[in-house]
Amino acid sequence: MHSTLHNQIAAAAKQTKADLVIQNGKIVNVFTREIIEGDLAIVEGMIVGIGRYEGEKTIDAEGRYICPGLIDGHVHIESSMVPPSEFARVVLPHGVTTVIADPHEIANVAGVCGIQFMLDEAKRTPLDVYMMLPSCVPAASFERAGAVLSAAELAPFFNDERVLGLAEVMDYPSLREQHPSMLDKLALAANANRLIDGHLAGLDADAVNVYRSARIHTDHECVTPDEALERVRRGMYVLIRQGSVAKDLKKLLPAIHEHNARRFLFCTDDKHLDDLWFEGSVDHNVRLAIQAGLDPLLAIQMATLNAAECYRLPTKGAVAPGYDADFLFVDDLETLNITHVFKAGRLVAQHGQTVFPAERSAESLEQPLLHSIRCQAVDETDLRIPMKRGTKAHVIEIIPNHLHTNHLITDVDVQEGAFCPSIERDLLKLVVVERHRGLGIGLGIVRGFGFKAGAIASSIAHDSHHIIAAGTNDRDLTAAIEQLRQQHGGLAVIKDGAVLASLPLEIGGLMTRKDYTEVLSGLKQIDKALKAIGANGSFNPFITLSFLALPVIPELKLTDQGLFDVNKWEFIPVEAV
């Protein structure tokens, strides 16, 4: 440490040459939101000066802008379907040099083993992966996940410097009623002087007071400007989300003004690999914000300095002395065209491709991570939804590109005393199969997929990650579920009993050890198959499907135990009285 500090101070004082000097660049100063000029001197991965410097090596920025590396403030890496080592190869070319990850997807399947897997995998990449420990495994007290994590099981992870705090507290009833297990986790984080993230989906100002009283300081679930302002006024940071399903950015931008802008940052939350590759990570958030009229320097500040300060990362988020040499070369601030990405002063990506060798995931994985689909085969008779008193039913209505759903009560087709899917009315059967211990099957009705044939199934079903399937007929539904059993999880599209496309995800039914290029190819085949059964392409059916089982986001969801009214916080029958 002393030798590093000595070398850095000596170079800053121009007593010795810097390791690297970046010349002819326009530095984006996120403290003052201005462009400044000068050489950038770097020693042992840290910026030591801006001015006139000599270096052992020089790089000509050729007049480009030099921006801080971008920070994704909240992401579930598992949603990319690849582990951190491959995830990094996709997001680094997009200028993302730091992420704040919540590994609660794999934790819901494999418990502490899943968290440790993600921490170990994160060491295989130059990307800085910080973790927030899952606070709600399972997501709600009645959920039957693959694990239940207590404060005692989480405590040892706080010894890892990459663990910044407690991840999104989404079980509001347990928080409001001061459930002992919830208080234990909050106290664990507070006593360790760590941060606590929130999850205030659909909650009002009174609930914000409850969250703030619990020392919870962020929310990424705002969908209206009023919600965002309620949180900021009470001292929270608001993460503006733009993911594969939840696309809240344009709606929230009106909440930002000169006096409150430092309380906003960006996140992706959940984003599929193909969306990350072709569209981008939080660089996409920045571009959208600029296109919508936000000052480019403010948008960059939100994606860098604001995020670093929110998560107490004092050496991240700026191009300035004393900060890590994580920076980007950008051709144009309006389009944020990123040409080069540097991590700790080393080039890691250039013109959309990484320039460091890939490191494969560990070949040997612990048993809880493999063969995690443990349910029995499902028969068509298991999928019968009785309708004994008429044709009225409670129906989940999808809102395209939103996590929320509508709760409908509508007429459905009934044959021989049971619900019959209707392609004409876009009323399909929805199935959730408990996959960790084979405990049961939940059945419901969903509107909005628009399929004309077939069925789809996935072992990605937030947050307990049971098998979830939607389809036009029972034959294809059972075939889709069986395909996932055989391939140990993943995605499948079925038509007329045949597999049109599938993507095995052998790590907990959530991720694969395959190269990201193979996953992109597999997702392309999935998209082709979805079109063959009638998907119109206006939203991602699989990501939408994956959130239909999450009973902490309103209004109506389906779990393995049945239909759940989130607003009333109770299970209800499918048939409406």
From Swiss-Prot:
EC number annotated for this UniProt entry: 3.5.4.2
The name this protein goes by in its record: Adenine deaminase
Pfam families named among the record's database cross-references: Adenine_deam_C, Amidohydro_1
One GO term (biological process): adenine catabolic process
Reaction(s) the record says it catalyses: adenine + H2O + H(+) = hypoxanthine + NH4(+)
Family matches, as Gene3D superfamilies: Metal-dependent hydrolases, Urease, subunit C, domain 1
Keyword Manganese: yes
UniProt similarity note: Belongs to the metallo-dependent hydrolases superfamily. Adenine deaminase family.
Co-factor(s): Mn(2+)
Protein encoded by which gene: ade
Keywords: Hydrolase, Manganese
Class of this enzyme: hydrolase
Key word NAD present: no
HAMAP family: Adenine_deamin
Transmembrane segments annotated in the record for this chain: none
GO terms of molecular function: adenine deaminase activity
SUPFAM superfamilies reported for this sequence: Composite domain of metallo-dependent hydrolases, Metallo-dependent hydrolases
NCBIfam families with a match to the protein in the record: ade
